[in-house]
Structure formats: structure tokens, C-alpha cells
Regions:
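A generic "binding-loop/recognition-motif" signal
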Residues: 10, 21, 56, 142-143, ...
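Catalytic-core segments of class I nucleotidyltransferases/pyrophosphorylases
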Residues: 46, 101, 107-108, 115, ...
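Hydrophobic packing residues within well-ordered alpha-helices of enzyme cores
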Residues: 14, 60-64, 238
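Conserved N-terminal catalytic core of the sugar/cofactor nucleotidyltransferase
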Residues: 2-5, 27, 31-111, 122, ...
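Short beta-strand-to-turn element immediately C-terminal to the catalytic PLP-Schiff-base lysine
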Residues: 148-150
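A short, conserved acidic/glycine-rich loop-to-beta-strand motif
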Residues: 130-140
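Glycine-rich N-terminal loop/short-helix segment of MobA-like nucleotidyltransferase
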Residues: 1-29, 42-44, 220
């Protein structure tokens, strides 16, 4: 099984920590966000990872080299221009199609600035059992941006802001708003179905395909610890969470 870590962001909300380093190398409890994410993936048995980079890209490459790639096979996908989640995955898509075995296995797509105890093994198992095209970890929590699911947890739309009208692609009587956790399980055939080009959000692709009847599913993650660490105060809170053994 393979994985991709999204690590190309500028990390502007983490300044001054990101004045001299990429977001992926910001530390929580003595470990970088990149190391924490790689450790989670490695625990799942993943040995092949691709990481997209942009801001201070060479520092990530040097860091990985200094740590022997943490015993993994790691490829780097450089972005001269930030491509967002969809464009980033599409550019790196070759990595998941390079051999016949990988082309049949789902892969993990994981934001580097997300800490969680989400059971990735269980999430992959559910993805396979449901024969989903993509499975998205999501929680009931406050957020200005929400994904909308039906009673069977099929993606039906999104609300991009509190003051914006929701975008509905699959009308349903009882839509359930959930906040996305930045963790996906994706079937490789999704890569061949991405029609969007350039800079685009992967959610755009998901919604277009959901409107066609493709199975884009939610994975309930309310029972797990989760924290976005894209802001300075969130990094500080995550350090406290670590002391309280909320994650490891």
C-alpha cells in the first residue's frame, strides 16, 4: 500500500515558525509534523510515500536524507506553483499507477498539518468493503466549511462558508453536515477520472463524480482524537494534548 502526504503549503498562519522552515518541519512535542505523519503511515505497513513540496522544499529533502527517509521509499513531487489538493495529487498520480499491484490497491492521502488517532486500518477496510471510489474521514464539529452527506454517508454537497448557500449535487431529504478531517482513502481508478487541470481542490473532483453516481463516502471519525495544526495556537494546544496522552 502507498500514501501521499500533502506538505506543499506556505504555512503563513504558523509564522514566525515558518519564517525559516516549511510547515512540515514545525515540531510538536519534539517531533516534526512530517515525522509524526510518516510514523502513522509506517504503522499501517506503508513503505512507499510521495510528498508534495513547495515552500522551503530543499529543507524537506535534506531533512529526509538526514533521517534515512525513516526507512521508507520516499519520492518528492515538487510544485513550482501551489496546485492545491487536487492539482497536487494529479501531478503525483504516476506514483500510484507505476506498477500493476499498486494500481489495484487503495492509497492514503493525508494532510501534514493534521494530527489524529483515526484508525487508518479500519478506514481502509471500510473503503474496500463498500467498494468506494474515495472515503473521507469526517466529524461532527464546528467548521465554516462542511461536507454534506446523505443517510448512507454518500457525499452529496458542501457548504464552503457560513454565509454561503450550500452546493448540492445529489439532492437528499436529510443531509448530514460533517467537517472533513484531511484524511482520505482513494482507489487508484479515481486518478483516471480527474478531468480538472492546474490548480484545483480535490473536493471539486469528488463532487463532480458524486453527481455522476460514483461512491464518495464519509467515514465517521467522532470517536477519534483530531486536531488541525495549521495555526500557531493549534500547535501549542497540540503540545498540551500530547502531554495528556491524547495522541502519540
Amino acid at each position: 500500500m502507498k500514501a501521499m502526504i500533502l506538505a506543499a503549503g506556505l504555512g503563513t498562519r504558523l509564522r514566525p515558525l515558518t519564517d525559516d522552515r516549511p510547515k512540515a518541519l514545525v515540531e510538536v512535542a519534539g517531533r516534526t509534523l512530517l515525522e509524526i505523519t510518516l510514523s502513522r503511515l509506517s504503522a499501517l505497513g506503508i513503505r512507499d510515500v510521495i510528498i508534495n513540496v513547495h515552500h522551503f522544499a530543499d529543507k524537506i529533502v535534506d531533512y529526509l536524507k538526514a533521517h534515512g527517509n525513516f526507512g521508507l521509499r520516499i519520492e518528492i513531487s515538487r510544485e513550482d506553483v501551489l496546485l492545491d489538493t487536487g492539482g497536487g495529487l494529479k501531478t503525483a498520480g504516476w506514483f500510484f499507477l507505476e506498477d500493476s499491484v499498486a494500481a489495484d490497491e487503495p492509497f492514503i492521502l493525508h494532510n501534514v498539518d493534521v494530527l489524529s488517532t483515526i484508525d487508518l486500518r479500519h478506514m481502509v477496510r471500510v473503503h474496500l468493503e463498500k467498494k468506494a471510489l474515495a472515503t473521507l474521514a469526517a466529524q461532527q464539529r464546528g467548521s465554516s466549511r462542511l461536507l454534506l452527506f446523505d443517510e448512507n454517508l454518500r457525499l452529496c454537497g458542501r457548504r464552503a462558508g457560513r454565509d454561503l448557500e450550500p452546493e448540492i449535487v445529489c439532492p437528499s431529504a436529510n443531509l448530514r453536515p460533517l467537517a472533513f478531517c484531511g484524511v482520505h482513502v482513494i482507489s487508484p481508478r479515481f486518478l483516471r477520472m480527474m478531468q480538472e487541470d492546474g490548480v484545483f481542490s480535490i473536493i471539486d473532483s469528488y463532487l463532480r463524480l458524486a453527481a455522476r453516481g460514483e461512491s464518495i463516502l464519509g467515514f465517521p471519525a467522532d470517536e477519534y482524537y483530531w486536531r488541525d495544526v495549521g495555526k500557531l495556537e493549534q500547535v501549542q494546544q497540540a503540545a498540551e494534548d500530547y502531554k495528556q496522552k491524547l495522541f502519540s
